[in-house]
Amino acid sequence: MPKPYIFKSESELIDLLGNNDTLTFVQNFYSANCPTIFDVVISGVTGNTFRAFRNLPIPPSDVFRVWAIEYIEESLIELSQIDDESKYAIYVHLATLSLCECWTSLTKSEMGYGRGAKLFNLVLKKFACLTSLTKKQKQTLINLQHVPLDSYTIVGLRDIAPNLSISSNSTMNFVKTPDQYKEFQTIISNIANKAGVPAIYYDILAWDMGHR
């Protein structure tokens, strides 16, 4: 597993976010087709992600996938019609709280806000590939997507955002509260705006392209 790349400066990150290699990679990522919500969830969060959850009475992948499929199916119309940042942020926040509550009920352990948001944002990242979405809906959702915060997207900001007190081994569990989560998303969004790209491009640069 490659180590997270720590971006040397904001200007370096801006240049990388907007270069042709990144833009081509993003285009290829979102050209994938997911016919069903099941496909979105299964391809969005793979088995390796669940290794962080150990010694549970129920397989963590089962708990998450059942919850995610049900949640997305029940809120499909709402999610498909979201068209502004505030509504999208509320949707992600409420879904994360729902996941954390379900997780505690079934596993008798704490998911944690940061880990819950990361898993759900991975699903939402892939949700833009759902074939039933119109081109306009797809692009709107890509523009609104939040960055899944894990070791790659968190540690990548260590030198750019020293006020976040990121260590070299920070993981998705580093984010504890909604306010902390919002601070990360705001910093990433501001940098992405300077590059003229959606915030989710940072995740694709830090994670997907870092694992080529």
Q: What do the predicted segments below correspond to?
A:
Residues 50-104:
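A glycine-rich, hydrophobic loop/mini-helix early in the fold
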